[in-house]
Amino acid sequence: SAMTRMIKRKGTEGFSDDIQRVVASFVMSNARMSAKNIYAAQIEKSIQDIESGKSVKDQAYVMKENVFNPKENFAQLRNFLFLWNLGGSIFFGLLNMTQPYMQTLPHLSQYVPIGDATRAILRGSKIAGSAMKNGTAPKGYEAEYNRAVREGVVDPQNVFMLSGVERGKTGASNSAWGVITHTMGLIAQVTESFNRKAVFIAALDVANKKGAVWLKKKGFNSAYDFAKDTVDQTQGVYDKANRSNWANTSVGAPLMVFKQFSINYVEQMVRMWKKEAASGDEGKKAVFLMLAMLASLSGMMGLPFIKDILDVSETTAAFLGNPVNIEREARLALGKDLADPLFNGVLNHFVFNNLGMDIQSRTGMPDLVPWSNALNPTLSAQGRINEFASIGGATGGSIEKGYDASQFIARGNVGMAALTL
């Protein structure tokens, strides 16, 4: 920590020779200490002002300790799962670049017509691309853009990368591994930065068009504040402060890998749906647009909670003596030509499947509640095992893949084992 370094300046063998790690540790520890000194009193006052009851206040104190504690539970495991599932994937990069249209477009459509929101995002994407290519702030946006870069609004991944260097180990092998992991994460890093910069510029344009009076009415002091809020709401905040307390525990951390995106997605829909009509914001229309955008890629069977709803319905029907597979019956009733694009997604069915890609499994979030089908009496033994394993998320999925691969190896089928992994 910064305090330890000030009290006792002592070289540590191996550590002190690793210049990158020393500098990263210096920057991050001082940043944490400075932030704590600046915000600790304000955080304490906010907690003391909570009037929702002792349990809420207790959870707030737990969150405070989680944020102040620099330790990241299972950081290496989460890093491995990212590299294994998404690292170096061009397909993931292209899919990631749909996020401004999947989430930001509906958000901005609350305030301006859909056509205007679309044009703002397209223009923002063009300007952001040029800015990243030239390495300079876009003309006309210099002050806001440079501030957003400085405050980590559009490049938050740099903080996570510095934290990774700080936690790293020394030695040539670890240096080589660091180069590999950095290279594999470049696609995600570049596309994430591009998304945020495009959204930031698009939101600035919308805010400037609406004017200062409108911004004040909505609770924003400036166009910058509105743009920052738009980035946070639609591109996600992935730091420790925005995770549940359970996700910061040793048990919850490995189980919640890759869950934050779906949580952010559902929370955004809830926020928009709760907008009062008197506010002038078309929140409910934005929710339907958001669901339509998702359905175009993942189909009806990829919408949030849809599988959980079907699981509960089918379990209830089975206990009443009328077992049924609702999706299968619906497909039979509609016919293949109509059911496939409707259930699998129009774009997924007509475009991506023909290219050998499956967008539905990457974008859909139908099974958000674990064990929703666990009590179904018609479930097979393997289906029940899979249902209970679903709580493990990406971690459990990797373990399951490893087990399946070992079974193929035991039967001498190394090729299938490799494909399974």
What are these regions (language model features)?
Residues 3-343:
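Hydrophobic, often aromatic-rich secondary-structure segments at membrane interfaces
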Residues 305-392:
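Glycine-enriched catalytic-core subsegment of oxygenase/oxidase enzymes
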Residues 258, 395, 399-402:
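Hydrophobic, well-ordered secondary-structure elements that form the walls
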Residues 261, 265, 349, 362, 404-421, ...:
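Hydrophobic alpha-helical segments
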Residues 60-63, 399, 418:
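Composition-driven recognition of long, low-complexity, acid-poor segments enriched in small hydrophobic
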